[in-house]
């Protein structure tokens, strides 16, 4: 009897643990982190982006809507027409964990805000789901985004990253080129540029410190007038050749000018 009671309690505890584990697993959030050096500086500003989440309409439909007031050639995801209210303006907030609001240089600040913007509003660029918050771990110098663990916030049928990555569409009637996904190459170039720049200026490596010392701004030097030097050399060479060719002792009939030519011009 005691053995059966112990077995019953064992299975009951196991079942309860399984339910708790399943609940935690379903509610657990994943974290995507990038190492980003948090160098301190004296420059900070905010980034405001005016954007529209729209796909390009078909050429014939865009031609019909081109002259209509308040319309353009971009359709919202899942719609076949693009209205003026589809536009929105975002004001980026600074992620928590970075209180002094300073980074080293303009490009670093733009890359920092670009990651925060992309992770919050376009997480499908990183292949993650709904992002709950973006934070900074100053101890490990990480910038992280917590998400729900799913692959994408946009359905597969309208996934811009999967369908239109690095693809250009030409509107025949307008004659303009529209980049269907501008955020991925823009953010990637900023991120690579800033990480390489911070790695080069990292105080950990003596080689990078030496490069930074070499690249420090120096006092400008006076420009050298190469034309002036060339004219002097040519004048000297010409005068020497004239002296060799026409010596004054052997040519008594040479008339010398009474007034020297003016060189002011």
From Swiss-Prot:
Membrane-topology annotation of the record: Single-pass type I membrane protein
Keyword Transmembrane helix: yes
Xref: Pfam families: Arteri_env
InterPro entries recorded: Arteri_GP3
Region (Disordered): 239-265
Parts of the chain that traverse the membrane: 8-25
Glycosylation sites per record: 27, 42, 50, 130, 151, 159, 194
Key words, A-Z: Glycoprotein, Host endoplasmic reticulum, Host Golgi apparatus, Host membrane, Membrane, Secreted, Transmembrane, Transmembrane helix, Viral envelope protein, Virion
Presence of the UniProt keyword GTP-binding in the record: no
GO terms for cellular component: extracellular region; host cell endoplasmic reticulum membrane; host cell Golgi membrane; membrane; viral envelope; virion membrane
Subcellular location: Virion membrane; Host endoplasmic reticulum membrane; Host Golgi apparatus membrane; Secreted
Assembly and interaction partners: Heterotrimer of GP2a, GP3, and GP4. The GP2a-GP3-GP4 complex associates with the E protein.
Known role: Minor envelope protein.
Family classification: Belongs to the arteriviridae GP3 protein family.
Name this protein carries in UniProt: Glycoprotein 3
Protein encoded by which gene: GP3
């Amino acid at each position: 009897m005691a053995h059966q009671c112990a077995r019953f309690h064992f299975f009951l505890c196991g079942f309860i643990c399984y339910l708790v584990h399943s609940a935690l697993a379903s509610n657990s959030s994943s974290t995507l982190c990038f190492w980003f050096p948090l160098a301190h500086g004296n420059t900070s500003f905010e980034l405001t982006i005016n954007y529209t989440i729209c796909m390009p309409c078909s050429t014939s439909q865009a031609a019909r809507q081109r002259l209509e007031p308040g319309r353009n050639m971009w359709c919202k995801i899942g719609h076949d027409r693009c209205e003026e209210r589809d536009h929105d303006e975002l004001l980026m907030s600074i992620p928590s964990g970075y209180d002094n609001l300073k980074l080293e240089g303009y490009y670093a600040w733009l890359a920092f805000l670009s990651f925060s913007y992309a992770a919050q509003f376009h997480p499908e660029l990183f292949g993650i789901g709904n992002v709950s918050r973006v934070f900074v771990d100053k101890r490990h110098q990480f910038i992280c985004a917590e998400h729900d663990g799913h692959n994408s916030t946009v359905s597969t049928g309208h996934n811009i990253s999967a369908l239109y990555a690095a693809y250009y569409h030409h509107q025949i009637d307008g004659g303009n080129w529209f980049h269907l996904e501008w955020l991925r190459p823009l953010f990637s170039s900023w991120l690579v540029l800033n990480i390489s720049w911070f790695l080069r200026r990292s105080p950990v490596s003596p080689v990078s410190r030496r490069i930074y010392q070499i690249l420090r701004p120096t006092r400008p030097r006076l420009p050298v007038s190469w034309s002036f030097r060339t004219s002097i050399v040519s004048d000297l060479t010409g005068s020497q050749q004239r002296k060799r060719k026409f010596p004054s002792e052997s040519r008594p009939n040479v008339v010398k000018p009474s007034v020297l030519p003016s060189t002011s011009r």
